[in-house]
């Protein structure tokens, strides 16, 4: 970052160092004497220097109007503070510009017209840059304007009394991060000084205060354009900063009027915060009445807040009642849905019972057919065996094995029929259990369901199958008894 030091015989690095001849820092007998120096510096460089802060009228910090610029000066009081009015409130030093400005009129005019080396050379280049800046927004220096308004108001509040010194610069950083050529034009520099002129020279707030007292605490009759023409602000600017009639064109007058409007708006806002703006004078008798008005305003605000709070509670109660009604309606709808679903499930249960009856009947018929087929086959074979009376060992063995296979196949068919019937019934029962109905709603249907009849039929079929197996075992044992072992056959018959 490039840094620039503007040439000045006083504002430089040596200002914070001891004078080799006198052996001490350069001092200023009053704060007004210091403002003579700093105002001349900012006028020549077209760079506004603002008062950043002050501490108990003993320490003052000045800085460049650009926030990013490192330029800074710390001015400190070197002895006991002596103020003519005894007021040691902060910001007194700014008010001393009032006396200085009258002294500075001819002084600044002298610099503007007769300093050809430093000021005019850089001023021309600054004017060239200003022609380009004219196309930009006129509010680029709003920060400087705001700071100037605050400083000027503080100056008026603390009157014109001079703070006696001595004062000395204890710290200085005289370098800027912007070249002299890029600084403000003379017109734009003057615009940054309008708030100070309004407050210090023209006592702008006092004028508005008087107008409020005469017009029921309003400034509605105040006309900015008329004030700019008749207040004398144009003459002050011309004399103090050397502007010509050509430089005071319409655009310049419009910008001055905008600054006046800004300061007027600040005053109105302050009165509104105090609660007295637009309040008739008959109601503003004393400070106690003003306090009472503020209390009434606060009470009205609290009452309005309570009313809003009650309205909010009523809205919440109404919303809750609507919600409960909505929930009740939902419950009725839900109960209707349950009853309709129960009716549908009742019909489904009857259908499932009919299906189970049909499946059980089919299974029983299949099992009975299988048993009947087996009995017929057994009777036919017994008749055939009795009629033929075959005594040969090979034929008897074949008949015995064929009977076993026949019994086994019949038993398998019956068992398979029972398994199929059982599987179908279980599948239908699963479907029945999957129906999404209440248990209590279907208990009556299950009591009247013919599942018990189906179970009874299956038990009968199972017991009948066991009897058949028992008969097969008895027949097998009888056949085994009829068989004669080889060792029991007489030897003389073995060869036959």
UniProtKB/Swiss-Prot annotation:
The modification Phosphoserine is found at residue 402. Residues 100-116, 294-312 have a biased composition (Basic residues). Pfam families: BAF1_ABF1. Residues 128-143 have a biased composition (Acidic residues). Extensively phosphorylated on Ser and Thr residues. Residues 82-143, 280-326, 386-412, 469-496 are annotated as: Disordered. Residues 397-412 have a biased composition (Basic and acidic residues). Keywords: Activator, DNA damage, DNA repair, DNA replication, DNA-binding, Nucleus, Phosphoprotein, Transcription, Transcription regulation. GO terms for biological process: chromatin remodeling; DNA repair; DNA replication. Residues 313-326 have a biased composition (Low complexity). It is found in: Nucleus. Its main location: nucleus. GO terms for molecular function: DNA binding. One of its GO terms (cellular component) is nucleus. Belongs to the ABF1 family. General regulatory factor (GRF) that contributes to transcriptional activation of a large number of genes, as well as to DNA replication, silencing and telomere structure. Involved in the transcription activation of a subset of ribosomal protein genes. Binds the ARS-elements found in many promoters. Binds to the sequence 5'-TCN(7)ACG-3'. This is ARS-binding factor 1. The gene is ABF1.
């Amino acid at each position: 970052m490039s840094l620039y030091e503007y040439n000045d015989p006083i504002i430089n690095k040596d200002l914070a160092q001891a004078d080799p001849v006198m052996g001490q820092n350069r001092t200023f007998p009053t704060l007004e004497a210091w403002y003579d120096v700093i105002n001349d510096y900012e006028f020549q460089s077209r760079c506004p220097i603002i008062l950043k802060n002050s501490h108990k009228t003993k320490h003052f910090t000045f800085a460049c109007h650009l926030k990013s610029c490192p330029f800074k000066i710390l001015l400190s009081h070197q002895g006991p503070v002596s103020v003519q009015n005894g007021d040691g409130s902060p910001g007194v030093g700014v008010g001393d510009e009032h006396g200085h400005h009258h002294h500075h009129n001819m002084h600044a005019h002298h610099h503007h017209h007769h300093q050809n080396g430093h000021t005019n050379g850089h001023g021309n280049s600054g004017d060239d840059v200003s022609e380009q800046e004219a196309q930009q927004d006129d509010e680029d220096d709003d920060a400087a304007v705001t700071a100037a308004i605050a400083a000027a108001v503080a100056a008026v509040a603390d009157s014109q009394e001079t703070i006696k010194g001595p004062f000395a610069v204890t710290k200085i950083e005289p370098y800027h991060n912007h070249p002299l050529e890029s600084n403000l034009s003379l017109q734009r520099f003057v615009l940054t000084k309008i708030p100070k002129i309004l407050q210090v020279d023209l006592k702008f707030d006092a004028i508005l205060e008087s107008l409020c007292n005469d017009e029921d605490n309003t400034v509605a009759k105040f006309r900015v354009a008329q004030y700019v023409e008749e207040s004398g602000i144009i003459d002050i600017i011309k004399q103090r900063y050397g502007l010509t009639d050509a430089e005071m064109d319409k655009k310049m007058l419009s910008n001055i009027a905008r600054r006046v409007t800004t300061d007027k708006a600040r005053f109105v806002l302050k009165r509104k915060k105090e609660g007295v703006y637009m309040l008739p004078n008959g109601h503003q008798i004393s400070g106690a009445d003003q306090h009472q008005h503020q209390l009434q305003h606060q009470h009205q605000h609290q009452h309005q807040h309570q009313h809003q709070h009650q309205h909010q509670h009523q809205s919440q109660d109404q919303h809750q009642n609507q919600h409960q009604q909505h929930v009740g309606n939902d419950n009725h709808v839900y109960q209707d849905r349950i009853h309709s679903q129960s009716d549908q499930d009742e019909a489904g249960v009857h259908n499932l019972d009919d299906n189970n009856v049909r499946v059980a009947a089919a299974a029983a018929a299949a099992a009975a057919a299988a048993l009947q087929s087996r009995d017929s086959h057994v009777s036919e074979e017994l008749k055939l065996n009795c009629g033929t009376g075959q005594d040969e060992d090979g034929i008897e063995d074949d008949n015995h094995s064929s009977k076993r296979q026949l019994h086994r196949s019949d038993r398998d068919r019956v068992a398979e029929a029972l398994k199929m019937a059982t599987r179908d019934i279980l599948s239908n029962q699963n479907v029945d259990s999957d129906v999404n109905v209440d248990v209590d709603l279907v208990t009556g249907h299950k009591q009247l369901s013919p599942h018990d009849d189906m179970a009874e039929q299956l038990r009968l079929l199972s017991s009948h199958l066991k009897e058949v197996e028992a008969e097969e075992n008895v027949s097998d044992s009888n056949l085994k008894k009829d068989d004669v072992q080889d060792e029991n056959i007489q030897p003389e018959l073995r060869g036959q």
